[in-house]
Amino acid sequence: MTDMPPWEPPFNGDEAAALFGALDRQRTTVRWKCADLDTAGLSATTGRSRLTLGGLLKHLAVQEDYCFQVKILGVPMPAPWDLTVWETEGDDWEFDSAAADAPDELYSLWDSAVARSRAAVAEITERGGLSSAAAISLPDGSPVNVRRMVMDLVEEYGRHTGHADILREAVDGRVGEDPPWPVSD
């Protein structure tokens, strides 16, 4: 099956390939749902919700860095994130502040965060893979493994991929689970 889309998780891969493949599939779908939009498209809401595609991009960029950099690798949040902003601006800062960001800035924030996360996968693999301890621990000091942290991020994407489906359809009618893929007959 060489004609599979590049975002399709492997059908016969090991646990790490399946888990990171599932994460990449969610990433690809969210990025496609948010692609090629101007400020109005990224700022559009539906119903009574304040949620926007731009807000989702920024939120997921934060989540990528917080998961891989802080929770797993134990390094500080990279630029441009400043964790004190949530203390002063509230828990929804990334969602609300996205309205002031240009589309190229939002796409760049997300793309850069995903690139950092993908680079972190090599370090994770080198230090023991999914079963290795993440940098964070439970309040009682018990270790948390990398597997759980990555599963949490897959869950976060799953939740917001559904939101992105609804928001994008409201913007311009784009529907579908996966980006178009050229398949040769």
Say what each PLM segment does.
Residues T2-P9, A16, F20-D91, A133-D185:
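Short, contiguous alpha-helical
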Residues G90-S132, R147-Y157:
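Acidic/histidine-rich alpha-helical segments that form the ligand environment
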